[in-house]
Amino acid sequence: MNQPNPNKQPIVQSTSEQTSNEEVDTVLGRFTLFVKDLSNGLNGSQEVPPSQESVSEEAEVISRKIIVLGQTFDNFDNANDYIESKLWLSYRCGFEPIPKSIDGPQPIQFFPSIIFNRSTIYSNFANLKSLFDKENFTSDAGWGCMIRTSQNLLANTLLKLYPKNEPEIVKLFQDDTSSPFSIHNFIRVASLSPLHVKPGEWFGPNAASLSIKRLASELLQDQEIDGIKIPRVFISENSDLFDDEIRDVFAKEKNASVLILFPIRLGIDKVNSYYYNSIFHLLASKYSCGIAGGKPSSSFYFLGYEDTDLIYFDPHLPQVVETPINMDSYHTTNYNRLNISLLDPSMMIGILVTNIDEYIDFKTSCLDINNKIVHFHPHTLPVQQDSIINQSWEEVQDEEEEFINLNVSKIENEQQQEQGQSTDAPDEFIDIGNQSSSVVSVPSNV
């Protein structure tokens, strides 16, 4: 009988070796399941992707009210129909190529995001090679979720304004350079100063809000596209609104509408419970356009809630670009829920008002419930030597104007510069994407 050698040391793998082996096993396991499922799918059996599992069936009459973009429902079927009527934009594959940046992410990095999604393979199996271009991005799977949720927010804003113009609205978001709100144009305007976002890099709320503003500003304010007039876009970075500025917009422009975007962070690792009721209030407002945000590593479009569960559309299902446009692919019967305690603190909130009376009504509702997120001021404070607070949101007129973090007043910046202090503190917002990727931050003072 062999005796154990007391001098022989057990073989212990390093942490890095163990992690590497685990990653390999995970990938191999996923690939095995993928091939098995693909084989079953090509033989006629398909499953709904896990990320798109629908909400569970409920009784027709529910005990708790469902709130969706300012509408209240006590009947599940009615709520379900309303949710399904909203526009849903998700990952797309096979769109007009977006050239990669020399020093940016490589398209091949996102190969797993496409190959491990059965729906993409089923719908485009014959043209599989066209999805994998080493020099160009032909899909945003794996990196474009914040862009897609921002498109969701903007598209449903336009749908509130023009409920009978759904086909015309969807045309504005087609994945090509000629469509005003395409992913191509989001990338184009975000590549400018101060963001410098490259194709394949993840957006955060700041980048998303500035991109929407720039794209809207490129269109003449009095110009209509297929009967659709694009609203004015304002960014309130630290959630301050000034009454006199809103009044000026409506006084100067007849039939104006204003989309106010709040790119905010409401906590460190998770949303502080202090803000829960305020988030629910903004979603319940009849002026709500929803929230683009999510949980860590993913961005979702939140459009309502039931009790403490937020209702959202998930953009992480890749669909193949179709010509002519398949309108059914811009609606989904599979929406999900997320408890507010799991919500990532970094988000972009949208509010739409179409006249000064609506703004006053929105303001009154916020003051009545003591909303902790939005703050109102009667007048814009002039920039003076004794000023400690600067205007907290500004309007971009063209590409040359910069996106300024107005949490720091100009006077404070000047004082810091006189004292030799740096004013280039990084933006506190984190990107909602794969956290292993590089984070695009916006400088506070540019």
From Swiss-Prot:
Enzyme kind, highest EC tier: hydrolase
Source species, domain of life: Eukaryota
Keyword presence, Nucleus: yes
Keyword Glycoprotein: no
Signal peptide location: none
SS bonds (residue pairs): none
Reaction(s) catalysed by this chain's protein: [protein]-C-terminal L-amino acid-glycyl-phosphatidylethanolamide + H2O = [protein]-C-terminal L-amino acid-glycine + a 1,2-diacyl-sn-glycero-3-phosphoethanolamine
Pfam families linked: Peptidase_C54
Biased composition (Polar residues): 1-19, 412-424
GO cellular component: cytoplasm; nucleus; phagophore assembly site
Major localization class: cytoplasm
Biased composition (Low complexity): 436-446
Active-site residues, record numbering mapped to chain: C145 (nucleophile), D314, H316
Record-listed E.C. numbers: 3.4.22.-
GO biological process, one term: protein transport
This protein's UniProt keywords: Autophagy, Cytoplasm, Hydrolase, Nucleus, Protease, Protein transport, Thiol protease, Transport
Protein name as annotated: Cysteine protease ATG4
GO terms of molecular function: cysteine-type endopeptidase activity; protein-phosphatidylethanolamide deconjugating activity
Function as written in the Swiss-Prot or TrEMBL entry: Cysteine protease that plays a key role in cytoplasm to vacuole transport (Cvt) and autophagy by mediating both proteolytic activation and delipidation of ATG8. Required for selective autophagic degradation of the nucleus (nucleophagy) as well as for mitophagy which contributes to regulate mitochondrial quantity and quality by eliminating the mitochondria to a basal level to fulfill cellular energy requirements and preventing excess ROS production. The protease activity is required for proteolytic activation of ATG8: cleaves the C-terminal amino acid of ATG8 to reveal a C-terminal glycine.
Subcellular location: Cytoplasm; Nucleus; Preautophagosomal structure
